[in-house]
Swiss-Prot record:
ATP binds at residues 228-234. Catalyzes the synthesis of GMP from XMP. GO terms for molecular function: ATP binding; GMP synthase activity. Coiled coil: none annotated. Pathway: Purine metabolism; GMP biosynthesis; GMP from XMP (L-Gln route): step 1/1. It comes from Cereibacter sphaeroides (strain ATCC 17029 / ATH 2.4.9) (Rhodobacter sphaeroides). Residues 6-200 form the Glutamine amidotransferase type-1 domain. This is GMP synthase [glutamine-hydrolyzing]. Keywords: ATP-binding, Glutamine amidotransferase, GMP biosynthesis, Ligase, Nucleotide-binding, Purine biosynthesis.
Length: 518
């Protein structure tokens, strides 16, 4: 297998560290994020990075136990780029000075102007005299380390861009990875070019290497995979099937909470088109029976999660002799499981997943997507020949329509919701808007309203249309449909879906709202 050059991102706790990795992956550079406390001298030796980036972070170098890189990182002889706190830590370690941010803190947009000296990492910068950047710092560098020079300044950051070209050490006080630094991607491109990366980490290469890894890990053993029809599990299943053929059996659990025609689409796609061994477990009666009378969203999620594990175990036992469980774990999941702080966080919503399955079933994990971000999974799906209708699908929650039907769930409500959702998505596709939107769906509200249809009075449900734009689902804005589109959609839903007589549009952003209603 090809051994790719690797870039190490040492994470000091920034909220946007994953964006650094995304920018580098877009340049076909393989990189990994590791929290500073895990990066020991032994780790550095084993990882053998071709370049290193220090992320930003919320700490102060003056704080007791402040995050620090291992001293040996500066002796590797590879280029290093420090960002924000990463700049401060670099100066602190190499003999410069950092001061507390009394009156010199900068948060938000700023403009950096160049000095007379130019730096190769800044090729393409300052063509119009100054560059917009995004600052977010309290402390600041007051004296640069020996060997460093200043290459860019801002009103509150006289050392906004510094570098020691002889050692290929560079440090900036702003965040090049965020969209608010328009030429940030160019800075990363220059950095990896100076470090000698070939840009050879492509999805074609990843596919070949992943297949070889799966074959080496699994041998002649059997694998089971929980298939939901979503992008992650679909790509994982097709990749594993390409590697080991019918040693893989997929289990598709239909909990009765899927969209219109969804179960049939998944079965047709994987059993008929890909000829995969597939167990279609129609357990809708079990799930809907257990959810009868349940209105609390957390209880809904936990009931569905518990039953899913029970049902999956039951049907997986039918496979017989399976040693491995395949999961569509992605790189953000891996990063979060070895998080910078390891501290507790508030549970906003329980996540429906199969996290408890491997231990319960005594199975080993196959996770062929664990090095990839979501956009890379989609690219791999295209490489594998999955149809765009699957690859480009909007995210769909594990608990399905249960959390788009606030209050108690009934079969009647689910049928109304399915049909309204199908009309809405059809409208979005007809107007060519589907790919502009991160996620769109209908929520059926636990509210009945009076209406007039023909000469008669109606007393039916209200529904809410939801459509958001987002990059990663962490934050989201509502999609600005035209009034004509909304009016046309409302008319179609009311005319075509029996049981709804009022349509609203949800214009809440995230935060303060969440994307889903429950």
């Amino acid at each position: 297998m090809t051994q790719h050059d690797r870039l190490l991102i040492i994470d000091f706790g920034s909220q946007v560290t994953q964006l650094i990795a995304r920018r580098l992956r877009e340049l076909n550079v393989y990189c990994e994020i590791h929290p500073y406390q895990n990066v020991t001298e032994a780790f550095l030796k084993g990882f053998a990075p071709k370049a290193v980036i220090f992320s930003g972070g919320p700490s102060s170098v003056f704080a007791e136990g402040a995050p620090m890189p291992p001293a040996g990182v500066f002796d590797l002889g590879v280029p290093i780029l420090g960002i924000c706190y990463g700049q401060q830590v670099m100066m602190h370690c190499l003999g410069g000075k950092v001061e507390r941010g009394h009156g010199t803190a900068e948060f938000g947009r700023a403009f950096v102007t160049p000095t007379a000296e130019r730096l190769a990492i800044l090729d393409g910068w300052f063509e119009e005299g100054r560059e917009q950047v995004w600052m977010s710092h309290g402390d600041h560098v007051s004296q640069i380390a020996p060997g460093f020079q200043v290459f860019g300044t801002s009103p509150n950051a006289p050392f906004a861009i510094t570098g020691d070209p002889a050692r290929h050490f560079y440090a900036v006080q702003f965040h090049p990875e965020v969209h608010h630094t328009p030429k940030g991607a160019k800075l990363y491109e220059n950095f990896v070019r100076l470090a000698g990366f070939k840009g050879d980490w492509t999805m074609g290469a990843y596919r070949e290497e992943a297949i070889a890894r799966i074959r080496a890990q699994v041998g002649d053993q059997k694998v089971i995979c929980g298939l939901s029809g979503g992008v992650d599990s679909s790509v994982a299943a097709v990749l594993i099937h390409e590697a080991i053929g019918d040693q893989l059996t997929c289990v598709f659990v239909d909990h009765g909470l899927l969209r219109l025609g969804e179960a049939e689409q998944v079965v047709t796609m994987f059993r008929d088109h890909y000829n995969m061994p597939l167990i279609h477990a129609d357990e809708s009666d079990l799930f809907l029976g257990a959810l009868e009378g349940v209105s609390d969203p957390e209880v809904k999620r936990k009931t569905i999660g518990r039953l899913f594990i029970d049902v999956f175990q039951k049907h997986a036992a039918d496979v017989g002799g399976a040693t491995f469980l395949a999961q569509g774990t992605l790189y953000p999941d891996v990063i979060e499981s070895v998080s910078f702080s390891g501290g507790p966080s508030v549970t906003i919503k329980s996540h429906h997943n199969v996290g408890g399955l491997p231990e319960k079933m005594g199975l080993k994990l196959v996770e062929p997507l664990r090095e990839l971000f979501k956009d890379e999974v989609r690219a791999l799906g295209r490489e594998l020949g999955l149809p765009e209708s699957f690859i480009g699908r909007h995210p769909f929650p594990g608990p399905g329509l249960a959390i788009r039907c606030p209050g108690e769930i009934t079969r009647e409500k689910l049928e109304i919701l399915r049909r309204a959702d199908a009309v809405y998505i059809d409208q979005i596709r007809r107007h060519g808007l589907y790919d502009e939107i991160w996620q769109a769906f209908v929520a059926l509200l636990p509210v009945r309203t009076v209406g007039v249809m023909g000469d008669g009075r109606t007393y039916d449900y209200a529904c809410a249309l939801r459509a958001v734009t987002s990059v990663d689902g962490m934050t989201a804005d509502y999609y600005p449909f035209t009034h004509d589109f909304l009016g046309e959609t409302a008319t179609r839903i009311i005319n075509e879906v029996q049981g709804i007589n009022r349509v609203t549009y949800d214009i809440t952003s995230k935060p303060p709202g969440t994307i889903e209603w429950e």
